[in-house]
Amino acid sequence: MIRWLIIFLFPMILFADSFNDYLKLIQTKNLGPLGNHQQGEIEILIKEPLIQKAQTDTEKRLLKKGVASKLAEEWSRVGIIAEDSYLYWIRDAVIFPSGIYGTYDRILWKSCVEGPPGIAIAPIIHKKILVNLNYRHATRSWEIELPRGIRNPHETLLKACERELYEETGYSLKNHLLLGTIAVDSGILSSLVPIVYCHIEKPTERHSDFSEAISDNIALTLEELEHALLQGCCTVATPKRTVQAHVRDPFLAYALLQIKLRRLLSAPLLD
């Protein structure tokens, strides 16, 4: 009898621990406020009776849509749905500005719990912007992009900038200016990524991670990049290959606009 009781209760204990981890995670300062639905915001619920109501209401809506009972229960479950070494997929119980209870999913970079999740860099060399010719697994295509990457645990923003710049281009950072932050997809991603404008020097060999597919670094003028952005793609010929690369990087588009509006390329060198 005791054996079967342990078998029955053990998954419940594991779920309770996981749910407590979730509640602690969503109240981390860097993930933003819980919100107030009475002020027109989507409010995250942390009291268990309200969370249960949000789950139940969501499950009922799914059942009305014809979703199978087991899936409806699974798809309405609040908490940490999945995680790996890089990401959390979480589902929050919320109350919408309409007063209706429900759930809402978010994807979090784990590095954003203690600070900025990563860094994007607009490196300047001889008044040109250095970009990566990068093959991306997610899009299954060649892309023209700014150098960027995740921030390591306990790493400052400046250290992350210096490391990513060195790894992806081989250059050293001379001086820098924070252009701002970008929300890549505010509908699902919680992470806000800073973009840094910098002058670079002392080129060496790239030291890319084994999982990266950066073919080349290319220095282009602001006008060349604006034209490529308007076209949506460009033909890139390098000593290694000639490819048709897409030009649609949101980090690059944001940086180009900031650089142009601030007239940074015509300004004196940064101090």
Locations of regions flagged by a protein language model:
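Nudix hydrolase/Nudix homology domain
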Residues: 17-57, 68, 139-142, 153, ...
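Active-site-adjacent beta-strand/loop module that shapes the phosphate/pyrophosphate-binding cleft
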Residues: 94-98, 185-205
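The catalytic Nudix box helix
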Residues: 131, 145-181, 196, 207-213, ...
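Classical Sec-dependent N-terminal signal peptides that target proteins to the secretory pathway
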Residues: 1-16
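Short acidic/polar mixed-charge low-complexity motifs
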Residues: 71, 98-100, 128
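Conserved Nudix-box catalytic region and its N-terminal flanking loop in Nudix hydrolases
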Residues: 45, 107-163, 183
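Acidic, metal-coordinating catalytic segment for phosphate/diphosphate chemistry
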Residues: 76-120
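N-terminal positively charged helical leader segments and presequences
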Residues: 43-87
